Amino acid sequence: MRIRVPATTANLGPGFDSCGLALTLYLTLDIGAEADSWYIEHNIGGGIPHDETNVIIETALNLAPNLTPHHLVMTCDIPPARGLGSSSAAVVAGIELANTLAELNLSKEEKVRIAAEIEGHPDNVAPAVLGNWVVGAKLDGEDFYVRHLFPDCALIAFIPKAELLTSESRGVLPDTLPFKEAVQASSIANVMIAAILRNDMTLAGEMMERDLWHEKYRSQLVPHLTQIRDVAKSQGAYAACLSGAGPTVLVFAPRNLANKLQTSLQTLEIDADVLLLDVEGSGAEVFR
């Protein structure tokens, strides 16, 4: 059996800790034969565990402690610590592993709830489970979210080789915002969401670049954001914004501009991968 979970981008600018979008990069987990102990082969390196302390296995065992150990093989296109939901993908893969092997028959809603409990909020895990675009909130321990189709557009991901830990990126954020600024930040997010629902990416893109919640604070850790935004806007893109906590920057553009933008971004003197992606519509899947 094979489990496949998509990457995700969170925030989309002003939709801070609320908006998430599934992307066509994947964590794939092949479930092999039963074994005496858990072992997970993977291509990530970097100190990622191969035993039951791996997040995937740990998550599965928390849900189903009596699972029979298996040999697992993970391949992952989602680079860690780049703002593309790698940790959320691992958590969701663990939930799917337990659900499959222990025949838990979890609903998608239950999977989102469990994953959001582990991750703290649903912005990455909800689209990882459900696919497409999700707007969500966690209030008094309860998850509220709406899944909707995202407008058709090109997505160009500028993924620096250097990592940026979410903990570091969150450390530069203020504890509070002045009331007037928070009201303005909320109104910007509201207009962005309404524009997306109306398939108006021009207006949505303008709001994406007017975020007041987090990007201006994180820009000191992601100095290439302004440079990428300038290139993108000069060539007709809708917007460029941080993917999650960064350092990846996601560019939204008309499809006919995708190749040109990719080429232009590849010429920047920054060590990075520049990938053409799409919205992933299915979310986590199990292939038997």
UniProtKB/Swiss-Prot annotation:
Q: Which UniProt keywords apply?
A: Amino-acid biosynthesis, ATP-binding, Cytoplasm, Kinase, Nucleotide-binding, Threonine biosynthesis, Transferase
The family classification in the record reads: Belongs to the GHMP kinase family. Homoserine kinase subfamily.
* Sequence positions that bind ATP: P79, P80, A81, R82, G83, L84, G85, S86, S87, S88, A89
Q: Main EC class of this protein?
A: transferase
Q: In which pathway does it act?
A: Amino-acid biosynthesis; L-threonine biosynthesis; L-threonine from L-aspartate: step 4/5
List the Gene Ontology MF annotations in alphabetical order.
Answer: ATP binding; homoserine kinase activity
**EC identifiers of the protein:** 2.7.1.39
What's an example GO BP annotation here? threonine biosynthetic process
Fetch the HAMAP family from UniProt.
Homoser_kinase (MF_00384)
**Classification via InterPro entries:** GHMP_kinase_C_dom (IPR013750), GHMP_kinase_C_sf (IPR036554), GHMP_kinase_N_dom (IPR006204), GHMP_knse_ATP-bd_CS (IPR006203), Homoserine_kinase (IPR000870), Ribosomal_Su5_D2-typ_SF (IPR020568), Ribsml_uS5_D2-typ_fold_subgr (IPR014721)
GO CC field: cytoplasm
Q: Which NCBIfam families match?
A: thrB
Which PROSITE patterns does the UniProt record give? GHMP_KINASES_ATP
Catalysed reaction(s) here are: L-homoserine + ATP = O-phospho-L-homoserine + ADP + H(+)
User: What name has this protein been given in UniProt?
Assistant: Homoserine kinase
Where can this protein be found? Cytoplasm
One Pfam assignment: GHMP_kinases_C
Role summary: Catalyzes the ATP-dependent phosphorylation of L-homoserine to L-homoserine phosphate.
Here the disulfide bonds are none
